[in-house]
Amino acid sequence: MRLAIDLGGTNIRIAQVAEGKCLKRNSVACLATQDVDVILTQLFELIEPMIGETVEGIGIGVPSIVDTVHGIVYDAMNIASWKEVHLKELLEEKFGLPVAVNNDSNCFALGESLFGSGRLYENMVGITIGTGIGLGIIIHHSLYGGGYAGAGELGALPYLEADYEYYCSSGFFKRRNTTGAAESEKALKGDNDALLLWQEF
């Protein structure tokens, strides 16, 4: 069994995973505006109750470019204090388990390729839309991460008057004083304003 963690600017999610199945999960709102140590403490406290004798390792996806060999996180999107965090080293010292760190969109694409609908395809991309926007690339059933795991970091690409992330992430809804979840619920009930907002998105 392994622990799978998704560290995002909005939430930190964790799950116990074995043979492609999620056994137990938990999540907390990420204190993304706080210092590095505050967020690390959050992460440690989320991991501790999930650790058991059968846990063999930890995998964590982060919204940033990553030195995947050393597990160093650089300039995490929407987590301003995470400029250079030696996450692999910190987690391995704390829990005594092997740790793998990669870009969150890469983790998503690889998971879909191995266990999801991507299994049917030799080549695919997985697009993640949340606090930010990212993309993972699978070529011949293998992850193509590029330099610092950033091959699919399309959010910062210029688009219209800003970049893709400005228009195609949760910021789109935040600037309208709402959330994607709230507007999704309204749209499913046939709310015309919500439907128009999603059409614009």
Task: Annotate each predicted stretch with a short phrase.
Residues 10, 63-65, 130-132:
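Short glycine-rich anion-binding loops that position phosphate/pyrophosphate groups of nucleotides
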Residues 15-18, 34-38, 100, 115-201:
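Glycine/GP-enriched mid-protein hinge/lid loop-to-helix segment characteristic of carbohydrate kinases
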